């Protein structure tokens, strides 16, 4: 049904039109009454005559009007949509934006919408505008703040800030803009309040000095590790303190290399320090915090790289410029890697020098040799070359093996008299022989009979090659035998290892042996398997990973709480053993202090005093028999060539 012209339609027609025609001014022509929303004094100008569409339908103007209405509606819809996109983020558009940032190609081939979980933005450096005004997080540099002083509309930031109020559970975001009158230290406290303080400091360091901080230092995970050289970078130092730092640091250090740079955070001080004594990171941090008057967290503290040539060249080159203040003697690790003369002196590692060091210091353990030789790297060129080598473990093993070969050959060529003299020369203290004699008398042992048996014992006479010290517990048997064994450099064997075929192997590398605390089971084992060993005749000993070794058993001492001479089951051992009984408890002068001290110095004096009674060869006779008296050398000497 066709609608009538004008505004006199039914109520349903007004509802279909949207209801906005009801606010039109209504005039009753019969009585000339004016509606309340229209001015009475206003004159009619005729400008609103075209407001009512009274055209005749079908005149041909419907199509342009409909097209204009469609274009207007599209423009309005686009404007509203743009406004919605600015103030209310669409879930679909946000998800597609994130997926676009992660991988545009992957988003282009996706067939459906993926999960709406939050994803990290990979290619966006600045956070997107949320649409709720110019809210801003804490900035990292003052340049970023000055660039955002005004928003897109040209209004100040303070006029554009919006505070979130209500129960949405989100914290208010405010703008932190440093004022022009704020000092450098105050700015640092604000600027360094970031999520990763250390990363911020490292980034600022590289911008100022042009090199990465960790390219010059090595990292100590523990803050308790001590070191004499430290690299310190301090941020936010006052200008007056930075100027006087060279004088302030001198009482604490032997060497200082100080560089000062000016930045937006204040003065940045970069130092290479050598302290008077070794300090750990905590001590250095407290010391520098006290001198510079800054928090400890505003400093980077690590030890320098001692074997890095680029790092040494950096310190050497910057020390020559006018931007550094240096005092003290340059550390040797910088000199060694930068000066031409020191570089030419670097030589290749020589194993013979290491073997000679192990031989001279009587080192036959790999761990001891590796540790002690590495400590000589600062003063010995060969030790420094050893540390620079990639075959340190192989060199240590080979050096110890060669040292053992030399020691074994030297020991086998010596007689017992020569060996006692050799061991006595290693003792520099002066002792007294009387405590040994007094201890034997305290135990009821006649000194003359002991010397007679001891003389045959040292010579290795068959059937007299073993001395047994018998007695109850706590009488000093092990103390007496251990002191003699330590002086003569002997070996200890234990019956606990008798299940192994190699438990007698230590006897092949010693001049004297000790079997401590022999039990009845041990005596039964000796009676069955080791009779020839006690006789002093040649026996065959099995060695691990080596062929059987035939040797004459060295003199053997045995301590026991069981008297083997009183048991009939061991009657075949009676002629092979010389037994001394210790009856009395071991005497003490005070708790932990023996009344009769027996040590290497006392044993040295004892042998010197009893040398003739023990029928030992004199040193003069040994030299006459072909001993040159010169120390062993495994390092080739330099030949003096005439021109």
UniProtKB/Swiss-Prot annotation:
The keyword DNA-binding applies. Residues 180-346 are annotated as: DNA-binding region. Belongs to the papillomaviridae E1 protein family. It catalyses: Couples ATP hydrolysis with the unwinding of duplex DNA by translocating in the 3'-5' direction; ATP + H2O = ADP + phosphate + H(+). The lineage of its organism: Viruses, Monodnaviria, Shotokuvirae, Cossaviricota, Papovaviricetes. Residues 445-595 form the SF3 helicase domain. Residues 28-58, 119-138, 143-181, 617-643 are annotated as: Disordered. This is Replication protein E1. It comes from the Viruses. Its EC number is 5.6.2.4. Keywords: ATP-binding, DNA replication, DNA-binding, Early protein, Helicase, Host nucleus, Hydrolase, Isomerase, Isopeptide bond, Nucleotide-binding, Phosphoprotein, Ubl conjugation. GO terms for biological process: DNA replication. ATP-dependent DNA 3'-5' helicase required for initiation of viral DNA replication. It forms a complex with the viral E2 protein. The E1-E2 complex binds to the replication origin which contains binding sites for both proteins. During the initial step, a dimer of E1 interacts with a dimer of protein E2 leading to a complex that binds the viral origin of replication with high specificity. Then, a second dimer of E1 displaces the E2 dimer in an ATP-dependent manner to form the E1 tetramer. It comes from Human papillomavirus type 2a. One of its GO terms (cellular component) is host cell nucleus.
